[in-house]
């Protein structure tokens, strides 16, 4: 199976890596084009474009200027160990055992505003470029127009005709995939908490749960919807009444 995750704004380039394996992103030419455009933006421009503080504008200006090819293990880091948000705390990639790294690599794909789509061990350098950023790139009015064809083609080339495809990304990122031309149906998973007498999606918990579901899929080498329905990490369980077809709901 394949599953897609969103990236994280929070990055970790300090923790010692559990593996020396790394690969190269398939869309580095496109990434380089975007970086050349970002290099022309001042810190103040970036703050306005991304609706971030002056300090973050300066940080990302510095990141853009420092970004350069070729990527090596000394100036870049495998994506799954570089992202550090709630999803990645749920995934906890640092504790995935060596004998499961191939399953991780074959299963997880990370959508990215700068890199398009990443395999877990694809090298990345620090950046910030959310998919929803209103950045005009040549004739493309935004990053969705810039990336949609390449991302969808890249996924289709990898997907088997009957392979399970699970969306664990946010709407902002999943919109970068053209589901009309994707060669397999999309399975979705939502995670709800019982609060004030009803079940609802709470963003912080839902993000962590997406990461935990990705970890579960790797741990169990999930291949079918029934495999996914067994997800029981951190108190979650599958809700048959709330689920419908390929839209799975897990509650706790």
Kindly give the residue locations of the regions a language model identified.
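Pocket-edge structural micro-motifs
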Residues: 5-7, 240, 252
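Active-site helix-to-loop segments that bind/position phosphate- or nucleotide-bearing substrates
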Residues: 4-95
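Internal, well-folded beta-alpha domain core
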Residues: 93-243, 249
């Amino acid at each position: 199976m394949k599953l897609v995750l969103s990236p994280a704004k929070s990055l970790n380039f300090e923790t010692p890596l559990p593996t020396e394996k790394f690969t190269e992103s398939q869309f580095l030419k496109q990434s380089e084009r975007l970086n050349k455009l970002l290099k022309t933006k001042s810190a103040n421009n970036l703050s306005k474009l991304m609706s971030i503080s002056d300090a973050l504008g300066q940080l990302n200006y510095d990141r853009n200027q420092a970004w350069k090819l070729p990527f090596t293990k000394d100036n870049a880091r495998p994506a799954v160990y570089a992202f550090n948000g709630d999803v990645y705390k749920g995934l906890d990639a640092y504790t995935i055992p060596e004998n499961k790294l191939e399953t991780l690599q074959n299963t997880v794909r990370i959508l990215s505003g700068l890199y398009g789509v990443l395999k877990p061990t694809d090298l990345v350098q620090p950046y910030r470029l959310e998919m929803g950023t209103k950045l005009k790139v040549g004739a493309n009015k935004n990053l969705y127009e810039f990336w949609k064809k390449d991302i969808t083609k890249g996924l289709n080339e990898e997907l088997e005709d009957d392979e399970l495809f699970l969306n664990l990304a946010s709407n902002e990122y999943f919109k970068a995939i053209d589901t009309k031309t994707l060669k397999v149906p999309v399975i979705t998973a939502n995670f709800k908490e019982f609060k004030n007498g009803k079940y609802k999606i709470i963003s912080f918990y839902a993000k962590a749960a997406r990461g935990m579901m990705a970890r579960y899929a790797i741990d169990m080498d999930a291949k079918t919807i029934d495999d996914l329905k067994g997800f029981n990490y951190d108190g979650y369980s599958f809700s048959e009444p709330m689920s419908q077809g390929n839209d799975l709901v897990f509650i706790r």
